[in-house]
Amino acid sequence: MSALGVTVALLVWAAFLLLVSMWRQVHSSWNLPPGPFPLPIIGNLFQLELKNIPKSFTRLAQRFGPVFTLYVGSQRMVVMHGYKAVKEALLDYKDEFSGRGDLPAFHAHRDRGIIFNNGPTWKDIRRFSLTTLRNYGMGKQGNESRIQREAHFLLEALRKTQGQPFDPTFLIGCAPCNVIADILFRKHFDYNDEKFLRLMYLFNENFHLLSTPWLQLYNNFPSFLHYLPGSHRKVIKNVAEVKEYVSERVKEHHQSLDPNCPRDLTDCLLVEMEKEKHSAERLYTMDGITVTVADLFFAGTETTSTTLRYGLLILMKYPEIEEKLHEEIDRVIGPSRIPAIKDRQEMPYMDAVVHEIQRFITLVPSNLPHEATRDTIFRGYLIPKGTVVVPTLDSVLYDNQEFPDPEKFKPEHFLNENGKFKYSDYFKPFSTGKRVCAGEGLARMELFLLLCAILQHFNLKPLVDPKDIDLSPIHIGFGCIPPRYKLCVIPRS
């Protein structure tokens, strides 16, 4: 090697050491929770398994404790792992950690709506949206009748399969999508409607893509990856297409709005906008309402749809559990009466199975990212304002003290020694605190009523031997994505 080459190599090495030294000084300048040492530019990327980030969090928690610091690129994040740390962060520090961490794939919704909003409007918009949802029957009789009506359409669609194999992805998804569409737009779609199926495809594809390694990488290195080809472009395009559809519906509602007789949640939001028409500072705008409605449309469709689809796969894996459910349904409801929420009190096994499905699949394992809204002392550590806070829900739902053998699907996790339903404070699939899922009440009702209705009328028939059914998710990231499968539903005599 020439003298020039040696000199250049030494200069590069010296520059690298200088960067490491500067990074170490910055990293140690705060009393942060412990964590692995971050490298310049990439941070702790090598400590994360992008195909299964929750698994990486568990491994790091075993090494550094229930509260630890990571850097992904230059982004600092503090991970809360385990029931005590997660509950403390989300409830005792609900204001300090109520911000929303940045998700670049959803920048079209940034600082608007109720899910991805980290701006000054989210609290007021969320509060009004929740109040309006409750007034329209969230968790009460109004939504019960909505779901019961939709169960009728779902059962008719299932009968039309005539016992032949089908992919349940969109057929099952039609029911929760129609329920939320009725709340938002007072609209019911035919199960073969092309626009309806297109919307569900967009929701499903985005939930799938957001859970892939590339999107995990993109959401942490957007400035480097934004202009490269990749699936992030598809997600951004899909978000824009859904937003355009919702925008058209909002404009139609605005043109026919009667402020004295709101028809649905969209109308209620528009009425609030009209009240602010002459205000200098406006909380409600057409674009903001569009994003709020799009947020609710996506969340109200995909999460319940995926949970139901995963639940049917689990029940085919364990036919003895399905048989117990049939027995309980026959005893409490009978063959023809429509399932009702009041039945839940007399159906502890069904209630336990619905809870165990949600616990077992941990649909959103690492929660949506939170953000520290101010400098905060947490367990003696300083968590600076702007730090991303990750309360890991899977670490609570898979706690092996509360749920022995958490890797196994066991409805007994939610049953006492007398076979009665047993509540667990560790059951947090919807998160908790100020960012708890806005549709928790609706989702819980849908899961119980729709699963009851399906099993009241049909036996589930897998295309393979139950012991060969693989329940492992195909992707674990933003969500846990179940494998694609087909099944047959056989009418019960």
Curated annotation (Swiss-Prot):
Its main location: endoplasmic reticulum. The keyword Translocase does not apply. Heme binds at C437. Its cofactor is heme. It is found in: Endoplasmic reticulum membrane; Microsome membrane; Mitochondrion inner membrane. One of its GO terms (biological process) is halogenated hydrocarbon metabolic process. The omega-1 hydroxylase activity is stimulated by cytochrome b5. Pathway: Lipid metabolism; fatty acid metabolism. It is an enzyme of class 1 (oxidoreductase). The keyword Plastid does not apply. InterPro entries: Cyt_P450, Cyt_P450_CS, Cyt_P450_E_grp-I, Cyt_P450_E_grp-I_CYP2E-like, Cyt_P450_sf, Cytochrome_P450_fam2. A cytochrome P450 monooxygenase involved in the metabolism of fatty acids. Mechanistically, uses molecular oxygen inserting one oxygen atom into a substrate, and reducing the second into a water molecule, with two electrons provided by NADPH via cytochrome P450 reductase (NADPH--hemoprotein reductase). Catalyzes the hydroxylation of carbon-hydrogen bonds. Hydroxylates fatty acids specifically at the omega-1 position displaying the highest catalytic activity for saturated fatty acids. May be involved in the oxidative metabolism of xenobiotics. Belongs to the cytochrome P450 family. This is Cytochrome P450 2E1. The lineage of its organism: Eukaryota, Metazoa, Chordata, Craniata, Vertebrata. The gene is CYP2E1.
